């Protein structure tokens, strides 16, 4: 069975697809029973859908693959710590484990800016594993935003 690094590399490949599409490079995959059942990359601009974050796209793909919106026992791998919307989707989908690459200090809703998955009112708990391939995950998004800032400065 593949380990965390291997599945996170799959998520990084999805993030590369987002980058190539001009989107913020975030990628996600869903694994169930050791098998890849869902993939997604960040695509709100491409799809004109503000909810089309990598995690949501991957959860939707997995739900279609498994013919069930409840993804009990599944693990979601994502390159960057999920936002509040995506953290909520993990709970609603009953995902068993979240594995993320790099923290998101401004909007990370799992450990950084808030701890949404720890709220006592939730009816489902998601186990969390952080910092898998952290340098690669952080590096991809930092390079993206550095290039954007550089391009914006050239236009001034």
Task: Locate each region found by the language model.
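A cytosolic small-molecule/anion-sensing beta-strand core signal
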Residues: 32-33, 60, 72
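Immediate flanking context of iron-sulfur cluster ligation sites
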Residues: 68-81
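Short beta-strand scaffold segments in enzyme catalytic cores
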Residues: 26-34
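Small-residue (primarily alanine) positions within well-ordered alpha-helices
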Residues: 11, 15-18, 28, 38, ...
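Short beta->alpha transition motifs characteristic of CBS
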Residues: 37-44
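Conserved functional loop/turn residues at catalytic and ligand-binding sites
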Residues: 22, 70, 94
């Amino acid at each position: 069975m593949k380990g965390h690094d291997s599945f996170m590399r799959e998520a990084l490949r999805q993030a590369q697809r987002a980058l190539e599409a001009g989107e913020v490079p975030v990628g996600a995959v869903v694994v169930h029973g050791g098998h890849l059942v869902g993939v997604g990359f960040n695509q709100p601009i491409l799809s004109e859908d503000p909810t089309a974050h990598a995690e949501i796209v991957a959860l939707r793909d997995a739900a279609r693959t498994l013919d069930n919106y409840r993804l009990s026992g599944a693990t979601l791998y994502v390159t960057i710590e999920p936002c509040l919307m995506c953290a909520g989707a993990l709970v609603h989908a009953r995902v068993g484990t979240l594995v993320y690459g790099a923290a998101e200090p401004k909007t990370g809703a799992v450990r950084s800016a808030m701890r949404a998955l720890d709220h006592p009112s939730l009816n489902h708990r998601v186990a969390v594993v952080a910092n898998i391939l952290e340098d690669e995950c952080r590096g991809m998004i930092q390079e993206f935003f550095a290039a954007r800032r550089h391009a914006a400065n050239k236009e001034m």
